[in-house]
Amino acid sequence: MYPPHESFYHGLIKSKLWLCEELETAIYRECISKPSLHILGCWDNLLAFMLLTRKPTFYYEVHGYDINPEAITNANKVCDMWKYESPKVYNHVQDVNNYDYSTCINSIFINCSIDQMDSNNWYNSVPKGRLVCIQTTNMKDPAFPWYIKQTTDSLDELVERFNLSNLIYSGVTNIQYETNGYKRYMIIGRK
């Protein structure tokens, strides 16, 4: 069990705000209208809450996927508003590495949790040409609370790992505190 307020920590919110800003810019630039969002490894799906609060009519629907049933229970509470209002948010208990995304049309795939996943099989199932947004960290701690399984040492390494056919955005943001800090890397582009 994890503290339910953990998804509100400074570094996680800062990273998600950065993602919102850059993803919205990419969607405008690519002239994508009313996309469905698929947030893989969504945890409490605070990202859906943030995206829909910023641009409530921008998206068709949002799907959040997480392997942890407790996280999905929290996600359903965080996104309760969109059970009754549009766009709808659907949260699913699902191992994203064992799901077929090939039928997802006009969809954008977001994964901010690749560092905590055993593999990147999810990426193989995303249809070619779809917009993908991937965010990770240079943290290396496999213990609580980070549970890092896949390390990334640089933005270049992330770009090479996923080899997008059209890289629209790549960047780094620093999360710095008095005694420690880390980097977040993000890429947005067409698979």
Task: List each language-model region with its residue ranges.
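C-terminal substrate-binding/active-site "lid" region of AdoMet-derived donor-dependent transferases
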Residues: 118-184
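Conserved SAM-binding motif I beta-strand of class I
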Residues: 59-66
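Conserved class I S-adenosyl-L-methionine
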Residues: 32-45
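Conserved acidic residues
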Residues: 35, 104-107, 130
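Conserved SAM-binding loop of SAM-dependent methyltransferases across substrates and taxa
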Residues: 44-58
